[in-house]
Each structure stands twice: as structure tokens, then as C-alpha cells.
Amino acid sequence: MAGHSKWANIQHRKGRQDAVRAKLFSKLSKEITVAAKMGDPDPDKNPRLRLAVKEAKSQSMPKDNIDRAIKKSQAGDGDEYEEIRYEGYGPNGVAVIVEAMTDNRNRTASTVRSTFTKNGGNLGETGSVGFMFDRKGTVTYPADVGDADTVLMAAIEAGAEDVESSEDGHVIWCADTDLNEVATALEAELGESEQTKLVWRPTTTTELDLEGMQKLMRLIEALEDDDDVQRVTANFEASDEVMEQL
């Protein structure tokens, strides 16, 4: 999918920075706590919590942190978080979706709007760019789990929609509502996946040169620096040469 592997590479490179990593762990903990509070504190009985725990493990979050986040959900106190999605345009008309989890809607809306404005973008209404994305589930495996045909057959049997295989690994796509079932079936056939998550998959992309990518990254990093923001997705496309210069 256009932009997907490049997006993953950006996230991986950013994840090496300690400060970014600490903030990431904080966001992952919040997702785990909210998921556990909304359902069962046992990941085996709570699909959303299972996904949150798996994502935390894929980012090398310590088990103690994960357990502490689950226990926090059962404490009976703490903040009540509301999930909100913001949509807008970044530099060069790139569509941007911001997923937030906040205990103060007004504060978060003000901060997100200001961040868009200061970084060459503008915040739109809900639905203003959402039509350019599909909500999908993804299950990722390393390249050595099997060849493309082996993974494709397993994906078809599991009820997946699409498979992208490359030297970097295999990305299996499915309907968002089928992610838990598809991931479970794949793990029975191929073993534990590297990552299982819900994403926004762009249906159209905007090609950016180096200057455009640098401007977009400034916006994305500023948005991600907000503690209320959980995830940022953009429908950019860029050449390998541009990506290497970032």
C-alpha cells in the first residue's frame, strides 16, 4: 500500500529516541488502562485489551508497565478519558487523521487546532478527510515466517482481504471488524505475529518532495508531542530517495 512501509519506517526511526519512547510508553499505558476499564481486565476475554497489550509488547514495553496499566483500570478512581478523532489538512494538502484520548475535550481541541495552524495546516470538521481512508486491521509477520505463497494461503484461510509481501516482511490486511478472528487464525498457522493493530489505510495519496516531507514531519511530530494524542496518520507518498534524506 502506498506510503505504508514508509510510514512504518518513520515510526521505527522515531522510536529509537529515548524521549519519544517514554512518551510512547505513556500513550500505550493509557490505551491499555482504557481498554481494560471498558471491558474485562483479562486480555484473553477482551479483544481491544489484547490488541493494546500486543502493541505494547511489539514496542518493547516492559511487562511491569503493562501489568501496572491493567491494575490501574481496576483501582476505581483515576481520570475518565474520551476518545476523539480530529481531521484536517497538513502542508501541501496532505490529509491527516489525529486520534486522541483526553480528559478535557476543550483543551485538546484547542491544542490540536493551534498545532495544525502553526505548522502550515488547518483543522477541519469531522469527516473532512475521513473519506480518503478506510479503517482496516493489519497483522505483520517477519519475512522469514514463510514465502509469499505460504503467507498468502494462510491469509486466505484466515479470511484476510489482502497481503503485501516484501523483503521487509508480510503485511496482511483485513476488515477492521475481523481483526481479532483473522489474527487468531493466522497465529495458529504461522505463529505469533510481530504486530496486530487497527489502522487508517489511505485510498488516495499525495506525493511529497523533500521539503514537503520535512514540513509534514514537523506537523506530525508536534501533534505526537501532545500527551492527549494517541496516533497520527497521513496520506503521503514519497520516493525512497526523499525518505533516505529525512
From Swiss-Prot:
* Keyword vocabulary terms for this entry: Cytoplasm, DNA-binding, Transcription, Transcription regulation
InterPro entries, per the entry: Integrase-like_N, TACO1_YebC-like_2nd/3rd_dom, TACO1_YebC_N, Transcrip_reg_TACO1-like, Transcrip_reg_TACO1-like_dom3, YebC-like
Its main localization is: cytoplasm
**Where, subcellularly, is it found?**
Cytoplasm
One GO term in the molecular function aspect is: DNA binding
Q: Which GO terms describe its cellular component?
A: cytosol
Could you tell me which Pfam families the record lists for this protein? TACO1_YebC_N, Transcrip_reg
Please tell me whether the keyword S-adenosyl-L-methionine is annotated for this protein: no
Question: What does the entry give for GO biological process?
Answer: regulation of DNA-templated transcription
**Of which family is this protein a member?**
Belongs to the TACO1 family.
User: Would you tell me the protein name for this molecule?
Assistant: Probable transcriptional regulatory protein RD1_2018
The record lists the organism as: Roseobacter denitrificans (strain ATCC 33942 / OCh 114)
